[in-house]
Amino acid sequence: MQSKWKNRLVNLLSVVLLAIGLAAWIALPWTLLLPIAALLAVWLVVTRSGRLSLAAARIGIATLPQRWGSSSVIVVGIAGVVGVLVAMLAMGQGFQATLNNTGDDSTAIVLRGGSQAETNSVITRDLVPLISNLPGMATDANGRPLLSPELAQVVNIASKSDGTDVNAQLRGVGEQAWAVHTKVKLVQGRHFTPGLREIVVGKGALNQFRGLELGKTLTLGSQQWTVVGVFASGDAHDSEMWTDAQTLATTYNRSAYQSITARTAGKPGFAQFKAAMAADPRLKLDVDTTRAYYGKQGGGLNKLISILGTVIGAIMAVGAVFGALNTMYAAVATRAREIATMRAIGFRGLPVIMALMLETMLLALLGGLLGGLIAWAVFNGYTVSTLGNNFSQVVFQFKVSPELLWSGLKWALGIGLVGGLFPALRAARLPITTALREV
């Protein structure tokens, strides 16, 4: 009885240590993993045990075509884990990349003091002249400060995918908006005319929502609006529709602005602009760079997607581990006499363990590469939309980066490590005489 409980305790401790080791393995950066791989390669080539491990591994790998059906369970299972994990994380990374690419370090966004987003910010019209006279701002050829008082209105518009109504953002901007937002470029049509109900739509909005083609009219706020142009920015503004701020305010009875975007004279100009605003007691406002502001807007959603992706990947990984364990235990049982023969002619326990581990890791590597390739081919650049902090749809693309593919491979090799270790230990401990008698 005591021996039985001791074995259970040892097994439990082994599982806990293995889980800790697996988590540490997945967290390791490539700068540390490459030296580990190099040391393993040197050990395999230089030492006698390493060369015996390679020789035994070649024997096992040569028999893979004969048991490809069972081996494919490992490859397909791990490919599924890596594919789902990379796809989920690519969604979060793509969303964050879109927000991080919005704005720059020399463009300032001004919000009401304490406001975290435009939705709960109010800037009265009488503050605009005060802000426009602050030092540090860039000016146009006529010496006018480059700033754009803006307000955003959430409107309902039909989705192209299924026709259901979704939230889209109609942004009212000032006449200097095109000089302030330098990433926004007109690609079709013309700019809207101030005072008229005309809109220019972002390329992302055009691809995601119905009725935004050039020349089309749509009803917003019980008024008819005409699409006169299409712009592209490659950032969060691609999801928006732009119009004249005063026209939008009149249509929706908006008496104040929500934000002011201003172009400053580089980073020194921004610092001067921010200091001057803080020093003016009439301006109870917060100012930040547009890059920093938009970058913070997606932090919560990106973290949520990353957590969900990791949890789902971990659950699937457990299934893949059991699949690998089952396959490798079956392989050990089938090759019991072969393994016993190798041990009888001089292959000690360590080369046998390493040979089976190398075999499993090879299958895991194939699964990881397959899963990563599928995720990249299917999801990289795939365009979707989600609800942003302004309660409107933000259009973005999945981004399958080399870092995500590397993480997927680490997960695959970690699953292979766990799935191959215990069968390999069993093979090394199997009595030679018992194994040789098995048919």
Q: What positions do the PLM features span?
A:
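Hydrophobic alpha-helical transmembrane segments of multi-pass inner-membrane transport and secretion
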Residues: W68-F95, N302-E338, M361-L370, G414, ...
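Transmembrane alpha-helical interface segments in multi-pass membrane proteins
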Residues: Y329, R337-T383, S407-I415, P423
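Mechanotransmission and gating elements of multispan inner-membrane complexes involved in transport
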Residues: A158-D165, R210-G309
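Peri-transmembrane interface segments
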Residues: K4-G21, F95, G269-F322, A331-A333, ...
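Short helix-loop junctions at transmembrane helix boundaries
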Residues: N11-P35, L369-K410, L421, L425-L430, ...
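Hydrophobic, regular-secondary-structure patches
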Residues: A79-Q169, Q188-R190, G195, T250, ...
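Short beta-strand boundary microenvironments
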Residues: T164-Q208
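N-terminal Sec/SRP start-transfer signal
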Residues: M1-V15, A37-V82
